[in-house]
Amino acid sequence: MDSNTTSSFQDILVRMSKMQLESSSGDLNGMITQFESLKLYRDLLGEAVMRMGDLHLLQSRNGKWREQLSQKFEEIRWLIEEVRHRLKNTESSFEQITFMQALQLLLEVEQEIRTFSFQLI
């Protein structure tokens, strides 16, 4: 796992948590939860690629891993759209920077997950 990506995730999550404290938006809490879930999934997939012998373990433990992968891509697309929507509607420069960084991070993570999944297939 790239240490820059890890620190980016942590930075985005901290920033979103601060924004959540300043607003009453429950939607932001959902985004934070999905970001955390996505980070864990990406990390697990990356570890499986690093230990290619785990591919068989991954497949036997979760026979529906392709469905799970598809679901994660749907979540990424939803998060990208949600971040874009919030970016268009915010006037706070702190929030704009946070959402721009979140969007960039989501695109990077989507590419990483695609790369990992192709290596596993």
Swiss-Prot record:
Motif (Nuclear export signal): 12-21, 85-94
Pfam families, alphabetized: Flu_NS2 (PF00601)
GO cellular component entries: host cell nucleus; virion component
UniProt keyword annotation of Transport present: yes
Any single GO BP term: exit of virus from host cell nucleus through nuclear pore
Matching InterPro entries: Flu_NS2
Alphabetical keyword list: Host nucleus, Host-virus interaction, Transport, Virion
Compartment(s) where it occurs, according to its Swiss-Prot or TrEMBL record: Virion; Host nucleus
Gene3D superfamilies: 1.10.287.230
Presence of the UniProt keyword Transport in the record: yes
Complex formation: Interacts with protein M1. May interact with host nucleoporin RAB/HRB and exportin XPO1/CRM1.
Other comment: Average number present in a viral particle is estimated to be 130-200 molecules.
Record family assignment: Belongs to the influenza viruses NEP family.
Annotated function: Mediates the nuclear export of encapsidated genomic RNAs (ribonucleoproteins, RNPs). Acts as an adapter between viral RNPs complexes and the nuclear export machinery of the cell. Possesses no intrinsic RNA-binding activity, but includes a C-terminal M1-binding domain. This domain is believed to allow recognition of RNPs bound to the protein M1.
Protein name in UniProt: Nuclear export protein
Species name: Influenza A virus (strain A/Gull/Minnesota/945/1980 H13N6)
Taxonomic lineage: Viruses, Riboviria, Orthornavirae, Negarnaviricota, Polyploviricotina
Name of the gene encoding the protein in the UniProt record: NS
